[in-house]
């Protein structure tokens, strides 16, 4: 996967525009952090997030919603700036009512208890597995001991590798960004130009310290440098104060290495999440949102690690222990505890990951804890029915069970490919990603595409019902003679009743507890059917001529052409100057940082968005002097706004 490092970081005076691109122009385009003075964002309405939620990591994507009066728009084109008048709503990228609510969120006791519960689930799952493996060894059952311990080691090592790799990327990128920010403004009030990243030739008078690039799973990950606008001297002072010494960096590296060697990386991330949440409550208003979003990002990371561990360790462990129970026709207490802990861990990981994804996106409404509990019950009962069916069938047909698993995985992978998920750079990388998701589909539903999921949910669970019925029927017809109907019939009843209960909880979630549903849906004051219907511009902007638009666009085109000739690629930086402010009755604009992303939002499901948004987090958290969190604007939002501004100007 060829990734081009074309990233720049420029810090100028508050009257100029600073922008930071995503370091993969071949795939993801650019990320631009616009300087203060731009209008604040307005709205986006919710839709179903892929993966049960939305991005993990700091990103918010959005649609244009013009429901909040006086909110202002994002960086407009043609010099209009997309400013909303007092009577109309601003066309922007994130719903103002939703976004302001996110900024006012605070770390609560329930958040802390939820994370502690996740730690308890993790210890119960891994602890019972290790305890059972030791019990098998002491009883001389070496084959079962080896299989049980193998799945524990496989899941733990995989999680530690991913966790340490993310630490290396985050730590190295943070050091590079702080060093660049510290050296960018040697004197107060001086113009600063700092370029961070490798790639094309550096411009005149620009320094280019390289930043490591991280690529994980089947996604392209890019390093992001960020700029602080309007506060040159203070920003440089704070950045230089945060620059770590060599001894401090060595101690951090040593500590993290020991933590991950001892297989405690996931536990450390859980407690680090709690620490960041407590810091967000104890910090001032300017630092509160920064620590809060760091906590959200960290929890998204550890939730993804938990999800990875469950499908590498808990799911096969659960099937293995149930097969042993069926073959031996006996149930030990420790085996029952191990199976129950693995089942709870699977359901918890899916529900917790969806909550983390929705919490990390500012265009999505967060899921309430009651909704998460309903989702947990949904996955708990459907996965329970699935693994019990697998255990019954595998106890009689070991070879055919393996063939069935491979065949089901192939069908699910082909179906996912047919859904046309779009994330990876090449078609073959996309297919590899779909193959990984196909493993999850063996046990449970996992949304991989944004939009309505009703039809796909119906197809998936209808296929699962047919498979469970066929496997259970074959087991009942060919079961061992010593298995009486007194055991077989209750087992079949448990399978189908558990599946039916899970489907009922799923319907309850979508009917009553989904953030877009009737109970927690948008209020009438924030619901916008048609963004264009509510889009209005101030009189002085609406009466501007097409000539001014053409002039401004010609300036941008010349600048983009210069970058294109220098870099030898299509320009990815499209920074549009805002309209000059004139004395009028226009309400004052709220100073805000806007990160523009040259991507279409709806093409990036939540599972894949986690990888992309881990790159965005550095741009978001680098606005150390910003009084409020920066807003993200995606490519489709800009297109809608440009069309509306063009039609209004005409």
Swiss-Prot record:
The feature of type site (Cleavage) is located at 567-568
Question: What membrane topology term does the record carry?
Answer: Multi-pass membrane protein
Ranges of Polar residues composition bias in the record: 21-31
Key words, A-Z = Apoptosis, Cell membrane, Membrane, Phosphoprotein, Transmembrane, Transmembrane helix
Activity regulation: Phospholipid scramblase activity is activated upon caspase cleavage to generate the XK-related protein 4, processed form. Does not act prior the onset of apoptosis.
Q: Of which family is this protein a member?
A: Belongs to the XK family.
Q: What is this protein called?
A: XK-related protein 4
Gene transcribed to yield this protein:
XKR4
